[in-house]
């Protein structure tokens, strides 16, 4: 299946990002897998498209504005158009409030917030160039809907992403551009595993205890899989979501009711 549309996914080498890229290829998109881990991005793109016709890999540090603009421009040049930007890349360190350093602050905000802002700007540039609307999809989190203990930096960045999403949706609506966000809950990914382990270590407890601090709140009784999230991104990237903008879809199995 092909829909002749082009998408870019940041943080696409593994976890949720890879599953999003995989689903978009299944939906007929040509996809750029963008990641700081160049080898990981190449492996992901090769898995998605052995001949490079449906997926390409691009190395980028999303906290660097030039990197993001260059990645989007390269994607548009390679595939001849640009339609969907998925700002998925993120960092999720455990940061008790008194332990946060200036370096940590700059690093996490650089990736989680600046990376989204640069992605919005870079996508907008291409939508204007090709003289059509488009879709921008940002990764926030259930931790961007309600603060989680011990995650000061992560939570505050994800709240910021929701704000950026709402403002950009209003600023760009007249150009036929929708801007929405998805808010995963506890997803079985390497990043979530590191958070669960760190939470347990902080408390001097086993890893299983760390997971329990998060999973006990899930109404549907199971940890989310990356596919649960990629299904929602597929909807936001497709025509069925054309009349939705400025919204955050919570994909957490019933952790937060807002």
Curated annotation (Swiss-Prot):
Enzyme nomenclature, EC number: 1.1.1.304
Example of a GO MF term: diacetyl reductase ((S)-acetoin forming) (NAD+) activity
SMART domains: PKS_KR (SM00822)
Pfam families (UniProt xref): adh_short
GO BP annotations, alphabetical order: acetoin catabolic process
Keywords for this protein: NAD, Oxidoreductase
Positions annotated as active site in the UniProt record: 154, 158
Class of enzymatic activity (EC top level): oxidoreductase
Gene3D superfamilies per the UniProt record, alphabetical: NAD(P)-binding Rossmann-like Domain
Catalysed reactions, semicolon-separated: (S)-acetoin + NAD(+) = diacetyl + NADH + H(+)
Binding site for substrate: 141
InterPro entries from the UniProt entry: 23BDH, NAD(P)-bd_dom_sf, Sc_DH/Rdtase_CS, SDR_fam
Binding locations of NAD(+): 8-32
Function: Catalyzes the irreversible reduction of 2,3-butanediol to (S)-acetoin in the presence of NADH.
UniProt family annotation: Belongs to the short-chain dehydrogenases/reductases (SDR) family.
NCBIfam families (UniProt xref): 23BDH, PRK07231.1, PRK08643.1
Name the record gives this protein: Diacetyl reductase [(S)-acetoin forming]
Source organism of the structure: Staphylococcus aureus (strain Mu50 / ATCC 700699)
């Amino acid at each position: 299946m092909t829909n002749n549309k082009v998408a870019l996914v940041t943080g696409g080498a593994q976890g949720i990002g890879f599953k999003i890229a995989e689903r978009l290829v299944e939906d007929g998109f040509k996809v750029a897998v963008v990641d700081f881990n160049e080898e990981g991005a190449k492996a992901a793109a090769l898995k998605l498209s052995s001949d490079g016709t449906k997926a390409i890999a691009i190395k980028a540090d999303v906290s660097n504005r030039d990197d993001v603009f260059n990645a989007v421009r390269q994607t548009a040049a390679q595939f001849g158009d640009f339609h969907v930007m998925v700002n998925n890349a993120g960092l999720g360190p455990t940061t008790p409030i008194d332990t946060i350093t200036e370096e940590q602050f700059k690093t996490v905000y650089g990736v989680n917030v600046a990376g989204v802002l640069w992605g919005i700007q870079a996508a907008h540039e291409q939508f204007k160039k090709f003289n059509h609307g488009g879709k921008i999809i940002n990764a926030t989190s259930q931790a961007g809907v309600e603060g989680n203990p011990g995650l000061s930096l992560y939570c505050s960045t994800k709240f910021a992403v929701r704000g950026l999403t709402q403002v950009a949706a209003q600023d760009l609506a007249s150009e036929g551009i929708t801007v929405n966000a998805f808010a995963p809950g506890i997803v079985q990914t390497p990043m979530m595993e590191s958070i669960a382990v760190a939470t347990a270590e902080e408390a001097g407890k086993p890893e299983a205890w760390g997971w329990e601090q998060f999973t006990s709140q899930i109404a549907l009784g199971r940890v989310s899989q990356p596919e649960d999230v990629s299904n929602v991104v597929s909807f936001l990237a497709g025509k069925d979501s054309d009349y939705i903008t400025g919204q955050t879809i919570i994909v957490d199995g019933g952790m937060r009711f807002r």
